[in-house]
Swiss-Prot record:
Keywords: Coiled coil, Cytoplasm, Cytoskeleton, Microtubule. Residues 123-175, 211-263 form a coiled coil. Residues 20-273 are annotated as: Rod. Giardins are involved in parasite attachment to the intestinal mucosa and in the cytoskeletal disassembly and reassembly that marks the transition from infectious trophozoite to transmissible cyst. They may interact with other cytoskeletal proteins such as microtubules in the microribbons or crossbridges, to maintain the integrity of the ventral disk. This is Giardin subunit beta.
């Protein structure tokens, strides 16, 4: 092996640590990119969970607002019906009173006329008075029957309104119960899905961390292998250096012996001359 060839081989061998450093740098960059992707994936899942939670809260609020609006409508309708019932009751009472007063006025007028006639016709006074009393009794009975019928209709109307209000309240209670049940199911589903998403994120994060550790282990093993190869190469370089130095020393010693012998021969030639 010539000195030029040995030098070139040594130069090529010494270039390999730079390749190793570059490879290790690339591996570190890949690991960093993987960690960043894992972090972005985790952040993305957390953001999706938060968006879903906000959407669920919005839907729940809409349901509650709808229930409140329905309650206001029912209360408004009840107030209107109550006011209408009071107006009808007052109108019926007013009509009955007016009718009673009108009939009474007519009866009073008739009684006055009859009395005047009876005063003028003394012979038929008793008969006319009897007839008058009978008419008064008939009219009074008619008025009482009419008043009783009006009050019965009024009570029936009031009972019907009360029954309708009770039915509306029952329907409202059933609606509230159904909404509460639906809200409970929605809440349970939201909680179940949130737990499932959190578990999925945790599992994905754990798997990513496990993969990262495996990659780090492989990289460390590769780095250890490369380091072993570097040590072997360095030992080979040191051995070649020692062998080359030994050969060079032998050459130098041989040259010195040759030069010494030449000088000795020249000295002997000079002496013989």
């Amino acid at each position: 092996m010539s000195m030029f060839t040995s030098t070139r081989t040594l130069t090529q061998t010494m270039d390999k640590p730079d390749d190793l450093t570059r490879s290790a740098t690339e591996t570190a960059v890949k690991l960093s990119n993987m960690n960043q992707r894992v972090s972005r994936f985790h952040d993305k899942m957390e953001n999706e969970i938060e968006v879903r939670r906000v959407d669920d809260d919005t839907r729940v609020k809409m349901i509650k607002d709808a229930i409140a609006h329905l309650d206001r409508l029912i209360q408004t309708e009840s107030r209107k019906r109550q006011a209408s019932f009071e107006d009808i009751r007052e109108e019926v009472k007013k009509s009955a009173d007016n009718m009673y007063l009108t009939i009474k006025e007519e009866i009073d007028t008739m009684a006055a006329n009859f009395r005047k006639s009876l005063a003028e016709m003394g012979d038929t006074l008793n008969n006319v008075e009897t007839n008058l009393q009978n008419q008064i009794a008939i009219h009074n009975d008619a008025i009482a029957a009419l008043r009783k019928e009006a009050l019965k209709s009024l009570n029936d109307l009031e009972t019907g309104i009360a029954t309708e209000n009770a039915e509306r309240k029952k329907m409202y209670d059933q609606l509230n119960e159904k909404v509460a049940e639906g809200f409970a199911r929605i809440s349970a589903a939201i909680e179940k899905e949130t737990i499932a998403r959190e578990r999925a994120v945790s599992a994905a994060t754990t798997e990513a961390l496990t993969n990262t550790k495996l990659v780090e282990k492989c990289v460390n093993e590769q780095l250890e292998n490369v380091a072993s190869e570097i040590r072997a190469i360095q030992e080979e370089i040191d051995r070649e250096k020692a062998e080359r130095k030994e050969a060079e020393d032998k050459i130098v010693n041989t040259l010195e012996d040759v030069v010494s012998k030449i000088q000795g021969g020249l000295s002997m030639v000079t002496k013989h001359q």
